[in-house]
From Swiss-Prot:
GO terms for biological process: arginine biosynthetic process via ornithine; citrulline biosynthetic process; L-arginine biosynthetic process. This is Ornithine carbamoyltransferase. Reversibly catalyzes the transfer of the carbamoyl group from carbamoyl phosphate (CP) to the N(epsilon) atom of ornithine (ORN) to produce L-citrulline. It comes from Shewanella oneidensis (strain ATCC 700550 / JCM 31522 / CIP 106686 / LMG 19005 / NCIMB 14063 / MR-1). Pathway: Amino-acid biosynthesis; L-arginine biosynthesis; L-arginine from L-ornithine and carbamoyl phosphate: step 1/3. It catalyses: carbamoyl phosphate + L-ornithine = L-citrulline + phosphate + H(+). SUPFAM superfamilies: Aspartate/ornithine carbamoyltransferase.
Amino acid sequence: MKHFLSIKELTQQQLLDLITLAKTIKANPAEYRHALDGKSVVMLFEKPSLRTRVSFDIGINKFGGHCLYLDQQNGALGKRESVADFASNLSCWADAIVARTYSHTTIEQLAEFGTVPVINALSDLYHPCQALADFLTLAEHFENISDVKLAYVGDGNNVTNSLMYCAAILGATMTVICPAGHFPDGYVVAEVQELASRYGGKIVLTSDIDAIEGHDAIYTDTWISMGDPTPLAEIKDKFAPYQVNNALMAKAGAHFFMHCLPAHRGVEVTDAVMDGECSLILQQAENRMHAQNAVLVTLFS
């Protein structure tokens, strides 16, 4: 594994190995306290971040590495100088680049023109670190990850894409339930279905909220993605039937609730579900660090 740009680029064994390593790191962190000794990692963020930035920074430091944060929120990469020049210069000093960008093309250019590993910390198309942490979380509750039946409810976005790739490659079942016009991009769905066919996964997309029945976990995200100027009032009525509340959890028979955060409480999910016994949101947040450290250890090994 040279970079970590998208889940779809991994084999089933590579994905399972990352989950296994993340479990080991979480259980025995002291054994890895020197795993990143002497390594310097640059973080380039065009978008705001809490969990991604803090989990990378603290995780890298816990393992003996050094993290440098470059705030790009006042302008996209490539405006002041080309992404190619940016990547090649950073590669002279840094051992890896972690990037959160508006365009996935920027991530790909960093990997193409740099000479060090690049990790996608979120782009418009994918959020692989989040999905890896989420399936690590599920793997802590299911002996066989392929037995998982996950339902995603709401707006099809970058998180949805990465979750679908994970489910397909791991041979799990995932139902994506979105209002009409808010499904993941067709070419992503086609890639996911090809991977599901290869690895034994089952991915279903529908607008029918009744399809929620018979799932182990319900996952949702904000109805409007970061940077989308659409007013919430314009879509609230359309999305209202897809709110995750106690009634929907009961209808699904779900034991777990998941959200990548930040959440709009009372909008896509109620407080009762967010703070309830079924909620895995803090476990997901903690697992971001362990999953990302597994990626870093793998890239540097």
